[in-house]
Amino acid sequence: MAEIQFVKVTKAFGSNKVIEDLDLTIQDGKFTVLVGASGCGKTTLLRMIAGIGPATSGHVLMDGKDITDLDPAKRDIAMVFQNYAIYPTMTVKENIEFGLKNRKVPKEEREKLIKEYAAVVGLTDYLDRKPGTLSGGQRQRIALARAMVKKPKVFLMDEPLSNLDAKLRVAMRTELIEMHNRLKTTFIYVTHDQTEAMAMADQIVLMDKGKIMQEASPEVIYHDPNNAFTAQFIGTPPMNILPMGEDKLGFRPERVQLGTQRLEGAPFARKGHILTREMLGSETTYKIQMGDEAIMVKSPDDTFQYDQDVVLSVRADDLYFFDKDGQRIRRGDVSNYDQYIQRAGGNNNA
């Protein structure tokens, strides 16, 4: 296991600085997910750890040791990519064994490691098969097993599930969580998919344009976002954010109470009209026109219908406020927080 630190790291391509003066600590033994849209800098950070995309300035540390300029082969890491990068002419066993042979690991130890990690990834019965005869998920497991037999201090994973179909992605997600729980190794996982990040991470690092927007556990990043960007990136559907003078008002779709009358005591209450209805089994998602704004509501109540008039209510504890720059306004930040709640109900019509 290992702790990774970025200290005042900058990465530039020519005159374009994609990451500037970044500080980040990735905790030892945690499953950390770097998440953000394409081009936000998450893979650039991963490549710096791997040593295949060195920092322009600043330092990358592993357990306090400066590895900024260390040869990638000496970093005690293993990397799994979006593409499987396995040898189609070799059997599963030969693929897993390949790196061990190159490192001149004795045969007896190789056999032991292959047996151990083939069992971890569920490939024991497929060791003599060629990759072409296996499913996409099984091929990705070969790549995982080949990384695991190295017993690295750090696993780096760059969107390893993005080539799999939706059902298989969910299954592999669970398997990766179980693998991390068994191995207790530092996992650093890159994805653009916030659902993957929320489902898998001990710690999420949300990035945008080379900057860290928030670093926190899934629970904190969802319930206590620092800014409007985080609030709307994390969550499906994303948080509804409405103008409120110079400031902004937000609330999660699932915290809206739908009905035919205003919820007693709710400071926010507006009339709306259902534009669309998506029944998803345990919950139903509604798109609702509310004055000049269209918002999303997620409810366990599937009795509301398309084209129906409804009343939307939100309790005070479920309201979020942001300033004109999108930064969160919390009760402890201002002395007049209750005035924000009153302002939230300024346009009530229900």
Task: Give residue spans per PLM region.
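Conserved structural motif at the start of ABC-family nucleotide-binding domains
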Residues: 4, 19-21
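ABC ATPase nucleotide-binding domain
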Residues: 5, 25, 61, 311-313
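The feature captures the beta-strand-to-loop junction immediately N-terminal to the Walker
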Residues: 35-37
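ABC ATPase nucleotide-binding domain helices that frame the ATP-binding cleft
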Residues: 43-46, 142
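Helix-to-loop junction immediately C-terminal to a conserved catalytic motif
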Residues: 50
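Conserved ABC transporter NBD signature motif
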Residues: 58-66
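ABC ATPase nucleotide-binding domains
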Residues: 72-226
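Non-catalytic connector elements of ABC transporters
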Residues: 237, 248-350
